Amino acid sequence: MEENGMKSKILIFGGTGYIGNHMVKGSLKLGHPTYVFTRPNSSKTTLLDEFQSLGAIIVKGELDEHEKLVELMKKVDVVISALAFPQILDQFKILEAIKVAGNIKRFLPSDFGVEEDRINALPPFEALIERKRMIRRAIEEANIPYTYVSANCFASYFINYLLRPYDPKDEITVYGTGEAKFAMNYEQDIGLYTIKVATDPRALNRVVIYRPSTNIITQLELISRWEKKIGKKFKKIHVPEEEIVALTKELPEPENIPIAILHCLFIDGATMSYDFKENDVEASTLYPELKFTTIDELLDIFVHDPPPPASAAF
């Protein structure tokens, strides 16, 4: 999508968030003029200063400032939204600005997790997925060029969640039988690959799925590999599916949402529950010169310099 050797200009919403910051860094690493839209009162000043030192252009504003968004769109080629779950429907404001500007060559909505058009989840998570589907249908109805990215599980986040490397206990919780397969990828890789596909003509109006064969595993296999890495055996405490389903009904919103996500990923195995369609593409096949960090390599990182645990907003 680069013309005359010029790199595409990329605008990122949610660039200071958990996955968005990796997209900003990936965009800068690949040499793209990179704009980061942020609230005027953002608390992420240190991160924004880092982005600026790396060459990012920081634009402060609110999503309600329609005219400002339109003018900003006219300066860029590609728009990526990495807004968190509570802001999913705010993407309609981004879409309105894209439609008025009329020049955007590619829009990537805030997907990046499960492939929402292929799965069904328990009600608390299904309601969030449905909001993402609404954004997709609006993109298609407006004939906005798009790429939908299904990056599956964020590896650092879920290794921290499942294995609890910061917790010295001798027990590990297993959700369901622990035998459902799932795909997970290192957040830094997700950021870099997403920038690659955002400017790749082969990904235009397609679903790109991050499912390299080296990064498919079960909970039990993950625990076994971790035990070998650190030379320690854990007692596995299984939480049965019925108990998890019951919790999604008993807990208030939004506390029931993470439980429903655990069910979707690690009991239903949603990231591996569907076959590829003709218009899908698996990310690792596009770029033989790149390599996803394998789960084994990521566990080595956790042994020597574990990434800090993170929390998600719902």
From Swiss-Prot:
Specify the signal sequence span: none
Q: Which reaction(s) does the protein catalyse, per the Swiss-Prot or TrEMBL entry?
A: eugenol + acetate + NADP(+) = (E)-coniferyl acetate + NADPH; eugenol + a carboxylate + NADP(+) = a coniferyl ester + NADPH
How the protein is affected by changing residue 157 to A/F? Reduced activity
UniProt record, GO biological process: eugenol biosynthetic process
For the site labelled Confers substrate specificity, the residues are 85, 88
**Tissue expression notes:** Trichome glands.
Q: Which residues form the active site?
A: 132 (proton donor/acceptor)
Q: Which Gene3D superfamilies match?
A: NAD(P)-binding Rossmann-like Domain (3.40.50.720), UDP-galactose 4-epimerase, domain 1 (3.90.25.10)
Alphabetic keyword roster: NADP, Nucleotide-binding, Oxidoreductase, Phenylpropanoid metabolism
Record EC number: 1.1.1.318
Know the name of this protein?
A: Eugenol synthase 1
Species name: Ocimum basilicum (Sweet basil)
